[in-house]
Design a protein with these regions (language model features):
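General beta-strand structural signal in soluble alpha/beta enzymes
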Residues: 73, 96-97, 119-123
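N-terminal Rossmann-fold NAD(P) dinucleotide-binding loop
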Residues: 18-19
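Extreme N-terminal starter segment of soluble prokaryotic enzymes
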Residues: 4-9
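Beta-loop-alpha module in the N-terminal Rossmann-like domain of NAD(P)-dependent dehydrogenases
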Residues: 59-89, 100-105
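NAD(P)-binding Rossmann-fold cofactor-contacting core
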Residues: 28-49
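Alpha-helical segments flanking ligand/cofactor-binding loops in enzyme cores
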Residues: 23, 85-86, 110
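Rossmann-fold NAD(P)-binding glycine/threonine-rich loop
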Residues: 98-118
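Active-site-lining helix/loop region of Rossmann-like oxidoreductase modules
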Residues: 12, 125-272
Length: 272
């Protein structure tokens, strides 16, 4: 592929997810190149890229769209607008992992429409997202998700802090939340992007219902999803191994981003 046809990729956030994505880009994905990264700790990011074949410059979030055709958001949910808005205004494709934050910043979709560009949400840990999207073309009557996480993967979530709910020293599973996907996204911004992606693929954040459990007996992030539709009844479960660097996210998440990037430049695309 000629240099002219190569799409430049910038990564916003260089932690447990962003670093893995950058490593794959540096090793080589056909049709793509790592153009820039953004990180809170510039020196740490530069040191992490010391072994890269082609180290990328570390820039501010607002400047990523100047250097790239695709901006991958791998940052805390509170930074979504700061990352996505300038990139979309410049007509760039934006890959959003903090899709929980996207639920309450849906005007970004309108901005993408006006600018003729796209926001892409990776499948992440959500098995059968394609099936949910297909079912939504027909009629879906119910979508329910039960999430179980090790207590340390939920510690510090705003909903727990605001409601005085402790997950320390648990000896048995404790249900800490029940409500809609929209409420879950606000209360657990670092924990339940899976719920937001499920809601956006299906019947929306206000009709999708969520339970969240802190369970000391599990060592994985477990998501059980039940979908009732006129075309099918779907029941599936994902047991995602938590990231060593950040237990709030799973190891599958960065790999899903890499798979999406490969799909963008591949002559063959599998899935809806």
């Amino acid at each position: 592929m000629t240099e002219h046809n190569v799409q430049r990729v910038a990564i916003a956030g260089f932690g447990a997810i962003g670093k893995v994505v950058a490593e794959h880009l540096d090793r080589g994905i056909d049709g793509l190149s790592l153009a820039a990264v953004s990180a809170r700790d510039t020196k740490r990011a530069e040191a992490a890229m010391a072994g890269f074949a082609h180290a990328a410059p570390v820039l501010s979030l607002a400047r990523l769209g100047e250097f790239a055709d695709i901006v991958v958001e791998c940052a805390p949910a509170a930074l979504l607008r700061e990352i996505a808005e300038p990139a979309l205004a410049a007509g760039r494709t934006v890959i959003v992992l903090s899709c929980g934050a996207l639920v309450d910043n849906f005007d970004l979709v309108d901005l993408a429409r006006r600018q003729g560009c796209r926001i892409l949400v990776p499948t992440g840990a959500l098995l059968a997202l394609d099936a949910v999207q297909a079912a939504a073309v027909g009629d879906i009557s119910r979508v329910h998700m039960i999430t179980r996480k090790p207590p340390n993967g939920l510690a510090g979530a705003p909903y727990l802090v605001q409601n005085g709910i402790s997950v320390d020293g648990l000896n048995e599973a404790k249900r800490v939340f029940t409500g809609t996907a929209r409420e879950a996204a606000r209360g657990f911004p670092a924990n339940v992007n899976v719920a937001a992606a499920l809601a956006l693929a299906g019947i929306g954040p206000d009709r999708t219902t969520i339970e969240i459990w802190a369970d000391p007996a599990v060592d994985r992030n477990i998501h059980r999803i039940e979908v009732e539709a006129d075309a099918a009844r779907l029941m599936f479960q994902i047991e995602n191994v938590p990231s060593l660097e950040n237990p709030r996210t799973g190891r599958l998440t960065p790999l899903s981003v890499v798979a999406l990037l490969k799909k963008l430049s591949s002559p063959l695309a599998i899935g809806t």
